[in-house]
Structure formats: structure tokens, C-alpha cells
């Protein structure tokens, strides 16, 4: 086993280790301010990423710095607080010990907020050949791939090769898929004519595929139709009830026997929770999520919690767990703050009750679909609304 991290114990304080600085982990670290706890935040990156806008980085709409927030700047005035950039590798629950890439760390409470990664459903070929969109590195890779495709298309005299370079297939018709399709449609309309005047914008194809019968299956049918109509007006080709069988030699094979000839495939068809070694197999549920009780605790270990995308809390209203979006992560973090404080004062814990404030997906610069509990609407200034829905 590796040597211990150089973080001294603080007398009279319980050590709370938070693995992951996403929306849930960051909210917990920022808002739990108590002399009863020494907080250690662990993350693979030295900054928080505002993931909902990664698609704009990928399509050259904004720079990575606009959605990256350094942890050391956020917490520079905090006392009893430590940050370590590392990868959590294995937990030893019987010893209250966490092993990381830079050493071991003892804990009194452990919060697993490791989020999700792209799910390729066991297809290694798709993982190697397609573009994902879960972090800044992937977004920048995608941006370079898109722009390089335009450059190559401008230089080639081969019509078939140019068609492959100018065809962009997006697999997954959820929020990320429709946002990416809308952003690419805007690139075709506004960027290509100015930056690549020698290219024929009509040769650029944007194809959005989904395995279900409609886009945005988490939204109402009315919202799904509104989004589909909007994208079609922007010449986005929509193919529903289509499953990808494989991708080889620039041929994206579909279950109906057809194939799309393209060098640009974005894979945003699903996610799976990031796992942590050392926990028993029965601690995990569908999608690699950790099964938790109504207090976000792992049933076998009362001092280990999971929040956000990695937590599977089953209820009558949410038999498959809460949606893997920002709101549940932030709300679970808030409830966990209260419960950690209550636990230290001997008070009973309070169960988590999810308050759905609504959902939103943006499609281009000034268009979005929004569903609140009592009303749904479209055609609004998207960015003015998004901050309210994720807070």
C-alpha cells in the first residue's frame, strides 16, 4: 500500500473526504463551513468544469477558460480545507482508508461524487473511433477535429473524401445531442461563409440519430416535436429508431442495414457512473451507480455517501433513480450538509426529497426548450435562463 498523504489530523475535527469536484462535490465543499470538519477535496483536474457548455467549446463558440474555475482560487480563503489533484483508486471501508494515485488518506466520512463518463455499451471500436464530450480535453479535440475537417475539405479535390469530411453524425438525441446539432447548424450558417468562403455550405450534412421514437425522451412529446421541427428547419437530418451497429473505414453502420459515410462521429448516446474499487459488487446498480438510501448513504457503510450522477436512490416516483443532471446533485449536496451537521450533534438525519425545478435544453444562440412543473415554453434567451435552473 502507498504511503499516507501529508495532511495532518486536526484535533476535534472529523475528516470529510470528497472525491470529485463536479456540481455536487463542489456545492458540498463550498457550503459546508463548520469547525467540526476538516475537508479534503480530491479531483483529477485542478478546476471545476461547467459541463453543460462543453458543446460550445467543441463548436468554437466559447473558450475553455469561460467554463473552467480553478479550485485553489475558489477556496483560497478557506480554513481547515485541503485540495489534492489525484485519482481515487480504491477504498478500504473496513479501515476507513482511501488509496489514491499520490498516497493513502484516512477519513471519518467519505463522499463519492465522481460523476459519469461516456457509455459505449461494450463496443471498443466506437470508443476508439468516435468523439465523446465529457471534459475539456475531449471538447478541444472535437473542436480541432471539426476545424481540421473544414481545412481538409477545402484542400481536397476528391468529392467523396470531401463528402466524408463535411458529414457530421451525432449519435444520441438527448440534450447534449440536440445542443451539439444546433451549434453545428449555426457554424454552417455563420462561420463557414466567412471563414471558409471556398466551401459550399450546402455540402455540410448534420445527421442526428437516436434509438428511440423521438428526440429528448426525458421531455414531453410536445417539446420533442418542437425541437425536431426547429432542427429540421436548420437542415439537420433526424434519424429515429436507429441503432449504431459499428463504425469502420469511415462507415457508420445502422441497424436498418444502411450506413453513413463520414469521418466525424460524435458519441453522446449514454453515460455510466465512474466506479471506485474496493466496494462490493452488490453496492452497484444499473449504469454502474452506487445504491444509496434516502440519506445518500451506502447501506453497508454508514460513513460513506454518494451524491449526484453516481448515486442511485430508488423511490416510487423515481424507480430508476433521479435523472443524472445538475439539479439532483446540488440538492443532494445541500441535504448532505445538513445531515453531516446533524450527525455530529446527535440529531436524526433528514431524508432527501428531490424538488424538480424544471429542465432546459438550448438549441443555438437564442432558442431553447424549457419545461417547468406547470408550464413549458420555447423561443427564449437560453443563457439567461440556464443559470436559474442549475442553481
Language-model segments: which ranges?
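Beta1-alpha1 glycine-rich phosphate/pyrophosphate-binding loop at the start
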Residues: 2-82, 89, 175-218, 266
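FAD-binding core/adjacent interface of flavoenzyme oxidoreductases
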Residues: 2-15, 81-169, 266
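A Rossmann-like FAD-binding core segment of flavoenzymes
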Residues: 79-90, 185-294, 300
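Short glycine-rich anion-binding loops that position phosphate/pyrophosphate groups of nucleotides
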Residues: 115-118, 181, 271-273
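FAD-site-proximal beta/loop scaffold in flavoenzymes
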Residues: 129-158, 251-253, 259-331
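A conserved FAD-binding loop/helix module that cradles the flavin
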Residues: 313-354, 360
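Conserved small/polar residues in nucleotide/adenosyl-binding loops
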Residues: 378-385
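Hydrophobic alpha-helical segments, chiefly the membrane-spanning helices
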Residues: 390-391
Amino acid at each position: 500500500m502507498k504511503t499516507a498523504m501529508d495532511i495532518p489530523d486536526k484535533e476535534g475535527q472529523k475528516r470529510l473526504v470528497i472525491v470529485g469536484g463536479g456540481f455536487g462535490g463542489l456545492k458540498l465543499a463550498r457550503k459546508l463551513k463548520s469547525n467540526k470538519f476538516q475537508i479534503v477535496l480530491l479531483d483529477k483536474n485542478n478546476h471545476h468544469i461547467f459541463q453543460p457548455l462543453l458543446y460550445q467549446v467543441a463548436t468554437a463558440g466559447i473558450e475553455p477558460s469561460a467554463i473552467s474555475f480553478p479550485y485553489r482560487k475558489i477556496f483560497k480563503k478557506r480554513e481547515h480545507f485541503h485540495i489534492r489533484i489525484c485519482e481515487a483508486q480504491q477504498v478500504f471501508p473496513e479501515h476507513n482508508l482511501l488509496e489514491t494515485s499520490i498516497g493513502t488518506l484516512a477519513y471519518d466520512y467519505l463522499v463519492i461524487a465522481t460523476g459519469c463518463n461516456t457509455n459505449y455499451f461494450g463496443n471498443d471500436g466506437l470508443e476508439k473511433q468516435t468523439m465523446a464530450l465529457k471534459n475539456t480535453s475531449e471538447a478541444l479535440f472535437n473542436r480541432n477535429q471539426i476545424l481540421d475537417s473544414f481545412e481538409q475539405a477545402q484542400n481536397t479535390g476528391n468529392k467523396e473524401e470531401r463528402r466524408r469530411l463535411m458529414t457530421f453524425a451525432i449519435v444520441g438525441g438527448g440534450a447534449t445531442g440536440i445542443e451539439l446539432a444546433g451549434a453545428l447548424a449555426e457554424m454552417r450558417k455563420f462561420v463557414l461563409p466567412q471563414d471558409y468562403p471556398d466551401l459550399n455550405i450546402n455540402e455540410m450534412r448534420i445527421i442526428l440519430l437516436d434509438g428511440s421514437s423521438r428526440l429528448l425522451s426525458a421531455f414531453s412529446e410536445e417539446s420533442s416535436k418542437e425541437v425536431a421541427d426547429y432542427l429540421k428547419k436548420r437542415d439537420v437530418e433526424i434519424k429515429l429508431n436507429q441503432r449504431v451497429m459499428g463504425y469502420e473505414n469511415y462507415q457508420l453502420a445502422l441497424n436498418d442495414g444502411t450506413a453513413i459515410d463520414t469521418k466525424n462521429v460524435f458519441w453522446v448516446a449514454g453515460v455510466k457512473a465512474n466506479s471506485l474499487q474496493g466496494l462490493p459488487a452488490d453496492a452497484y446498480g444499473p449504469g454502474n451507480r452506487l445504491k444509496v438510501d434516502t440519506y445518500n448513504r451506502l447501506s453497508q457503510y454508514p460513513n460513506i455517501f454518494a451524491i449526484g450522477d453516481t448515486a442511485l436512490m430508488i423511490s416510487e416516483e423515481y424507480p430508476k433513480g433521479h435523472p443524472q443532471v445538475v439539479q439532483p446533485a446540488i440538492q443532494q449536496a445541500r441535504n448532505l450538509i445538513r445531515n453531516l451537521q446533524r450527525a455530529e450533534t446527535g440529531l436524526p438525519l433528514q431524508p432527501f426529497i428531490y424538488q424538480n425545478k424544471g429542465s432546459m435544453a438550448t438549441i443555438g444562440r437564442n432558442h431553447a426548450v424549457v419545461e417547468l412543473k406547470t408550464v413549458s415554453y420555447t423561443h427564449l434567451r437560453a443563457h439567461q435562463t440556464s443559470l436559474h435552473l442549475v442553481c
